Amino acid sequence: MCIRDRPYRALYVISDIANLVLYHIVRYRRDIVRRNITSAFPEKSLEECISIERGFYKWFCDYFVETVKLMSVSRQELLSRIEFRGIDKIEECFDRGQTCAGILGHYGNWELLSATGLVIKKHPEAVIGLIYHPLRSQLFDRLFINMRQSMGGVCVPKKDILRYLVSFRSQNLMNLFGYIADQAPRYRNIHLWLPFLNHDTPVFTGAERIMRKMNNAVFYIDVERPERGKYIYTFKLMTDKPGEMPEFEITKKFFVMLEQTIRREPRFYLWSHNRWKRTREEFDKEFKIENGHVVRK
């Protein structure tokens, strides 16, 4: 029997075994995880940081089996495990003809958000989707697309999103797209640095530019995991007038809200990502920003 076909109870047994292997034997990215956690929380003792670290690996293995289960779980069973809050605010935006955008970080299980469209009842025609970066392997790329679209959402490659959104607007199609916006940009894509988890952090600003261009109502998606296999996704309105906000204000507000989410329960953040590998000192040494573009000095 494949992993995806096993009941959740059996999946979490597999997850526990994988956690032991990943943490104690393979030691997957242990150095990066430890460094990220201790530098993000200098006020915490080493024992507290190790507790977060162990919790992270346990959640990370759960995330994997929960995501694989998306390929076989029924919509009814999935909805029994997740709760959406703030959907009424999204439907109010759709009622007045305004499209929406959700912005979130790599926290909790972001893959389960593909089920959002199942709870938007007043506008069943609305397009609910996520933006993704295609994988190098066509096989795994197709596998992940099918998995993410199994709950009725659509996947749009990052490079094509603006074209899709313009097309939806020309057809008067209401839509809600999710942007995972806490990745580490390459040097040539750095236009803004922000304080985030005790680091001077380079951040992407492309999501905000698209939201302004499309006049989206922007929602921060707060994630909670009250118990194993249960998630609460709360859509919190950041603004329904993005064009009236100062430049980069949406991005700044997002990172403040994301840090609040992480500090509430740190173990569910993706600490294995080498988030702070690029520094402002290295950037300033080789690059500068001219007329909104990053160029070499």
Where are the regions that the model predicts?
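Short, contiguous strand/loop micro-motifs
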Residues: 20-21, 77, 130-132, 193-196, ...
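Non-catalytic C-terminal accessory region of glycerolipid acyltransferases
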Residues: 51-54, 146, 150, 159-297
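Catalytic core of membrane glycerolipid acyltransferases/transacylases, capturing the structured
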Residues: 96-159, 186-195
